[in-house]
Regions:
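Polysaccharide-binding surfaces and accessory modules of carbohydrate-active proteins
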Residues: 3-202, 207-213
């Protein structure tokens, strides 16, 4: 499992890299193993009620919804992809619903996961302070975990919720680059990990350090 590229990782399923989700049942047992159920393609861009998100007219974007389920807990996962073909942008979100009979505790619930192809990558991000926002830093992605985050209750100038992963020989005019940005104004966390096999993973979402959510049946 740890050698495979994943779209969204559960927990305690043999993938020892960064996970997107940490969920415990009423006994305190951790685990979530999602399997494919169905998918649909819809015109327009999905909406996130009560949350900031990108918007588009029906003809300007498409939405892919992939539905998955964990048989043990009854937890269902919807992966939402908003495709802006003309802008070369894909937006991501994840929706969790408890269809089981008992409450579940979420200790981590990321919005998206991105596994990159093999290769040597650099991480570009922007840090700052008062009157010195958006200071560029470029560093090699090593065999470890690098974190960009904020626990201020807002994204803040401390660390911008945005990063670029680029080939180490990439310049302003050539080379492969992947940009990841949180459309979110609260505390956030973006983790980058290069595994022992050379795969690079990005997990992006709400800050897990001060996050816990009791998900009741039907929610």
């Amino acid at each position: 499992m740890y050698k495979r590229q994943q779209e969204y990782t559960g927990c305690n399923v043999g993938d020892f890299r960064l996970s997107c989700l940490t969920v415990a049942d009423s006994r305190g047992a951790f685990g979530a193993d999602f399997t494919y159920v169905s998918h649909t393609v819809e015109a327009g861009k999905y909406q996130l009620t009560g949350l900031p998100c990108a918007h588009a007219e029906e003809n300007d974007a498409e939405t892919l919804i992939v539905r998955m389920q964990d048989e043990t807990t009854g937890l269902t996962l919807e992966l939402l992809y908003g495709v802006f073909a003309q802008q070369d942008v894909i937006t991501r979100a994840a929706r969790l619903t408890n269809h089981g009979d008992a409450p579940l505790r979420l200790d981590k619930a990321a919005s998206a996961c991105l596994d990159l192809p093999f290769g040597r990558w650099d991480l570009l991000h922007f840090h700052g302070r008062h009157a010195m926002e958006r200071q560029l830093e470029r560093e090699a992605v090593g065999t470890n975990i690098q974190t960009i985050s904020s626990v201020r209750g807002s994204s803040s100038h401390h660390n911008n919720p945005f990063l670029i992963l680029c080939q180490q020989d990439a310049t302003e005019t050539s080379g492969a680059c992947y940009g990841v940005m949180m459309v979110y104004s609260g505390s956030y966390q973006m983790d980058v990990e290069r595994s022992q096999t050379g795969l690079v993973r990005v997990v992006s979402g709400i800050q897990e350090e001060r996050f816990a959510w009791n998900l009741k049946p039907g929610e």
